[in-house]
């Protein structure tokens, strides 16, 4: 197989060391990822000069975005690091939030990987220039138009960033941020389940509806590490993969009796269900699967109220951006007050998740590396809107 190597455009970044110039691999077959590239931490003497402007994807209206030049580079606060973006990945929340509550001229995008080029004063004990990192930015932010990952630079609190282990490439790392944060917030903060470093002794079944999604992929693995027994739904073609991740059993969501089948398999014992899909059919399946004594249902999107058919089931939905501890001033139903308790949770969760990544205990979601850079992201989002992307995350080198 042929591969092409493209250097990132470094016209706005002056480096005192030539080895600091990042690069990306593109495969002639976009479904295949090349082996991880070696990365190096820069010596302390390395100096980065950052241009005042950058290219970024800006939201122009519902379903509309464009790549713009001359955009300001986000300011790096004492608690932040500034990252030169190498790769970005698309999530459903990117286009859903921009379609339903667009913040005009805000930078778009959530998941990224890249290299640290500025370290805020409060982060200097943990990060150095040139460190390889990944995370989830607060894109489409109505309060700060410079935030967002679909750009050449992103500023993000150091507490909300993972260092990339040596055996994970920038392309792979770009798929981690949103899924791992959402999985942790759902399982441990919202449902209150036992953490991986203190696994439960009395194993219980937990339903993950949508085990083929990126968040579902992480949830299945985290539940196993936490001592639970995950069962999941997905398409039949994904059965082998979700079982390899740790699912005790997989059920075809196309089956009209899916919920009843799960309830029978788990002997009427399920108390916890997570809905990674969130529509009337997925909610009905989860409510049917939850045992007769009731339980908790958590969705990753606003759920249809008409689907809340059981009084003994507590239903909630979460939005991952609450880990920033700031208000989410989007339109209803996405608008949220600041959740400082979620920020405190994130401060505890990220070090635990970092250890799991470092120890190789988490498999990452399948990805498809696309060409086209930032303009390609817009085209990929349009494909995702039309449900033309399944089972993989689209990744782009910037």
From Swiss-Prot:
Entry's EC annotation? 1.-.-.-
Return the Pfam families for the record: ADH_N
Enumerate the Gene3D superfamilies for this protein: Medium-chain alcohol dehydrogenases, catalytic domain, NAD(P)-binding Rossmann-like Domain
- MF term (GO), any: oxidoreductase activity, acting on NAD(P)H
Superkingdom of the source species: Eukaryota
UniProt xrefs under InterPro entries: ADH-like_N, GroES-like_sf, NAD(P)-bd_dom_sf, PKS_ER, Trans-enoyl_RdTase-like
Ligand binding (NADP(+)): 93-96, 212-215, 235-238, 253, 300-301, 389-390
Q: Which UniProt keywords apply?
A: NADP, Nucleotide-binding, Oxidoreductase
Establish whether keyword Signal is in the entry.
no
Tell me which residues bind substrate.
178-185, 320-324
* Keyword Nucleotide-binding attributed: yes
Q: What happens when the gene is disrupted?
A: Impairs the production od leporins B and C or any other potential open ring 2-pyridone.
The family assignment reads: Belongs to the zinc-containing alcohol dehydrogenase family.
Subunit composition and interactions: Monomer.
Q: What does this protein do?
A: Trans-enoyl reductase; part of the gene cluster 23 that mediates the biosynthesis of a family of 2-pyridones known as leporins. The hybrid PKS-NRPS synthetase lepA and the enoyl reductase lepG are responsible for fusion of phenylalanine with a hexaketide and subsequent release of the stable tetramic acid precursor, pre-leporin C. Because lepA lacks a designated enoylreductase (ER) domain, the required activity is provided the enoyl reductase lepG. It is possible that the dehydrogenase lepF also participates in production of pre-leporin C.
Q: Under what name is this protein listed? A: Trans-enoyl reductase lepG
